[in-house]
């Protein structure tokens, strides 16, 4: 995964609107079901579990087995009692970002509570180029992935505020090194928004992706 520095003030302006979900986490707690509540994250982000998932080979479908957090996407959100502000804010922010990035699909819009996590997995079921934005108010969280070159886990620690990373998540038809086994964990409220581009994009499509990345890094 490649870190992308966010310098574009227009993009930051849209992302800053999304901080509403962190600022209003009590609203989420009151109205939404928390996925993976009372799950101890330590097992699911451990080296032992990572090894188990890798050794499963293609028996691992690609999905994370478990995670803790609030899924905000309309097809994933689970209400305890409906609140119109939550989908309204999602629609507004998602639409602006999709237009800006020329993306067709919002893959993830997820809010993690303290001690929230995403278990080791590889997304082989949804191979694509991923543009991933993470907000952490204190930086006390991380994204970890298996580095095939060193055969070790590498952690990309969150920055205070917004950060971005970009990379290709491979499938089982690709070389092993294209499989990105990864997990995430946080000790504070944290959110991740991601958009995907076609894994089999044309040269023109890949050039467009690079233009998007350049735009994110432009002042």
Predicted features along the sequence, with ranges:
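Carbohydrate-recognition beta-sandwich/jelly-roll modules
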Residues: 7-14, 18, 76, 81-82, ...
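Compositionally biased, intrinsically disordered low-complexity segments
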Residues: 7-9, 25, 42, 56, ...
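Catalytic core of Fe(II)/2-oxoglutarate
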Residues: 144-219
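A residue-level signal for beta-strand positions that form part of recognition/binding surfaces
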Residues: 3, 106, 190
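Hydrophobic, Leu/Ile/Phe/Ala-enriched alpha-helical segments that form helix-helix packing faces
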Residues: 18-26, 89-101, 184, 197, ...
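Anionic coordination/interaction segments
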Residues: 1-16, 20-23, 27-42, 203
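Catalytic core of non-heme Fe(II) oxygenases with the double-stranded beta-helix
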Residues: 102-175
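Signature of the catalytic double-stranded beta-helix
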Residues: 31, 35-116, 122
């Amino acid at each position: 995964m490649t870190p992308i520095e966010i310098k574009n003030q227009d993009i930051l302006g849209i992302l800053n609107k999304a901080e509403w979900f962190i600022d209003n986490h009590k609203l989420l707690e009151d109205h939404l079901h928390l996925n993976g509540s009372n799950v101890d994250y330590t097992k699911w982000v451990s080296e032992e579990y990572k090894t188990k998932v890798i050794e499963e080979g293609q028996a691992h479908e690609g999905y994370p087995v478990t995670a803790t957090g609030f899924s905000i996407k309309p097809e994933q959100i689970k209400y305890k009692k409906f609140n119109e502000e939550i989908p309204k804010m999602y629609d507004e922010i998602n639409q602006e970002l999709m237009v800006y990035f020329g993306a067709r699909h919002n893959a993830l819009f997820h809010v993690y509570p303290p001690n929230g996590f995403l278990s080791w997995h590889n997304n082989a079921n949804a191979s694509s180029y991923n543009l991933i934005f993470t907000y952490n108010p204190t930086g006390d969280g991380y994204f970890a992935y298996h580095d095939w070159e060193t055969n070790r886990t590498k952690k990309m620690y969150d920055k205070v505020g917004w950060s971005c990373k970009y990379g290709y998540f491979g499938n089982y038809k690709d070389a092993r090194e294209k499989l990105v086994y990864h997990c995430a964990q946080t000790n504070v409220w944290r959110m991740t928004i991601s958009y995907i581009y076609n894994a089999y994009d044309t040269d023109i499509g890949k050039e467009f992706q690079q233009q998007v990345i350049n735009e994110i890094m432009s002042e």
